[in-house]
Structures are given as structure tokens and as C-alpha cells.
Amino acid sequence: VSAGRDRGALAIVLHTHMPYVEGFGTWPFGEEWLWEAMAGCYLPLLDLLDEGAPLTLSLSPVLCDQLEAPDLQERFAAFVEGVRRETHSEDAAGLRAGGHEQLARELDRSWGDYERALESMRARGGEMLGSLARHAQWTSSATHAILPLLATDVGVRLQVHSGIAAHRRRFGEHWRGGFWLPEC
């Protein structure tokens, strides 16, 4: 590229989606999957975005539905303080009993990640989706459908229009035209 010419730009787009698991219990494919994603991905990502990380965020309508569910904070806290605390404690004790102190310390460290995630959630007043709102620039199809696999053009249009409408309903007119094409 010669001097004085535009060098372009780089966009890092993070797309977030979670199949609908809210209200389906915990193990093996229920809400536990959502709680783990919140603790390990969404809440740490929110901390980065709040610090000004230059990322573009895409939220699927299905994930948004789950993040605005009633009593989200209470159910997440019950998972972290109950299930996760107990399993981490038991697993760390088992590792120590087996002579694996270094692995037990790593498990103790990872428990701290869960505590920080819960603290972050509480600091946000349980408003997971509200906290993501100012960062949500892109959307996706209504149910994260793989659009080329839909049987009709009408179905494709409905998925796209419904996804955009859901985004605008939640986040106002702040949609910037970005649309993630689901692939999985």
C-alpha cells in the first residue's frame, strides 16, 4: 500500500447464540448450558466491552429471549452458589486426596472465575440483556435457522425480518445493519 492511501479496516465480530434451554432443568442439556456460558463468556465479555474493547457484538434473538427471562439472576446465583460451588469443592478435595495439588489449585482458581461472574451479574442488578444493550450492534435470524436450508423464500424472509424486528423491539432503532448468517 502506497503512502497516503486508505489501508482499510479490520472488524472483529463476535456472534453469540444459545439454543433455547431456559426452563428445561439443568443436566445434561438444560439451563446449566446457559449458566456456564454466562459465567465463562457473556459476563467476562461484558466487562471487556464496558472497558471499551473495539468489538462488534451480534446477539441472536433466541439468546436475548433467555437473557431477559424472569428471575434470571436468582437462578444463575443458585447454580453458581449451589451446583458449581459443591462440584468444585468435591473435585478439588478429590484431586488433593489423589496427590494432585497443582490441579486442585487450578480448580480453586477457576472457582474464583465463577465468583467474579456472579459478582458482575449482581453489580449489573441482574440486568444481563440490559447490560448488553449498548453493545448489541448486530442481530441474526429469528431462531438461528440456517437460511439456505429453509424450504421457501417466504421462510427465509420471515426469519430475517423477525430477527431484525426482535432486535429493534429490544434495543430500539440502534440496529446498525449488521446481520450474522447462522451456520450451525
Ranges and model annotations:
Residues 1-32, 36-177, 184:
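Catalytic alpha-helical scaffold of carbohydrate-active enzymes acting on polysaccharides/glycoconjugates
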